[in-house]
Amino acid sequence: MSSAPVLAHTREELATLLAAARARGEQVGLVPTMGALHEGHASLVRAARERVTDDGRMGPVVVSVFVNPLQFGANEDLDRYPRTLEADLEVCAREGADIVFAPSVDEVYPGGPPQVTVRPGPLGKILEGKVRPGHFRGVLTVVAKLFGLVRPDVAVFGQKDYQQLALIRRMVLDLALGVEIVAAETVREDDGLALSSRNRYLEPEQREQAVALSRALLAAQENAGYGAEVALDEARAELRAAPGVDLDYLVITDPDLDELPAVVPPGTPARILVAARVGGTRLIDNLPLMLGTRGPAGEASPPNRERSEPGSAEQNKSPGEARTTPSGTSEASE
């Protein structure tokens, strides 16, 4: 096991710890988290370590552990979100993090709730932003704050929170923050469920039901060569067959979360994203797609599955199910 990271609770402690590294010209890596660390977070720390190591000289990796109240809605799980700092320190030690920054709310927001925040713009109003108003304003504000406190050269985020990743990249571009954003692949359980700190809320039966999300995405990925409509049909079929899954949205977009064009050329990259509740736990997931290259054997449609055509009776979804739009995307019904 690597040596234990140094724990900093205040911005002054953090600045002192980073000063020597900056004087040596070392790069600084940041992994922002809300704690309750798991193997997905561990992979982010490893990615940060790799990016700040140059010719054997290792710059410091900072892991922030801060449950940010600004990104929780009134009826969300702020109070019960797991706080496991001692266990988090063990994960950070194992993965070679140098500093764990675990500030209080007053340390991050010394003037109380901030009066100046980062507005996410149009990209923050769709998907998660539509379901969780104000969420991304809180996320971007705290990330900008952490960038100011740590002043990292590199920051690592997971692709599981894909919309968040896209918004952070946009914020860095629009505000010229000068931080390299590294996207790390989603880490999954053996059965495909994306790792999440909220998975611990799931009862055993709900845990089994939750795998339907990744099964749906894989079904879409396997059939994306037939086009977006078929991919969505296959994903819907998996979700409909799964008990206990309450769908918020299922959507295929381009990699930047814009709508697909009306005509999708073969080999067009895309992203499928899903959000659903299993019991009282809200889960999200996503996968990349490559659209329009037809099936592996050149079939025009997938075997053993009749799919609906746009405008057919099958498109009359009940609330919460996916609905197809003319662009080939899909979003949850109101």
Curated annotation (Swiss-Prot):
ATP binds at residues 34-41, 158-161, 187, 195-198. It catalyses: (R)-pantoate + beta-alanine + ATP = (R)-pantothenate + AMP + diphosphate + H(+). Its main location: cytoplasm. Pathway: Cofactor biosynthesis; (R)-pantothenate biosynthesis; (R)-pantothenate from (R)-pantoate and beta-alanine: step 1/1. One of its GO terms (molecular function) is ATP binding. Beta-alanine binds at Q71. Keywords: ATP-binding, Cytoplasm, Ligase, Nucleotide-binding, Pantothenate biosynthesis. Residues 288-334 are annotated as: Disordered. Pfam families: Pantoate_ligase (PF02569). GO terms for cellular component: cytosol. (R)-pantoate binds at Q71, Q164. The active site is at H41 (proton donor). CDD domains: PanC. Its EC number is 6.3.2.1. It is an enzyme of class 6 (ligase). Belongs to the pantothenate synthetase family. Catalyzes the condensation of pantoate with beta-alanine in an ATP-dependent reaction via a pantoyl-adenylate intermediate. Homodimer. The reaction proceeds by a bi uni uni bi ping pong mechanism. This is Pantothenate synthetase.
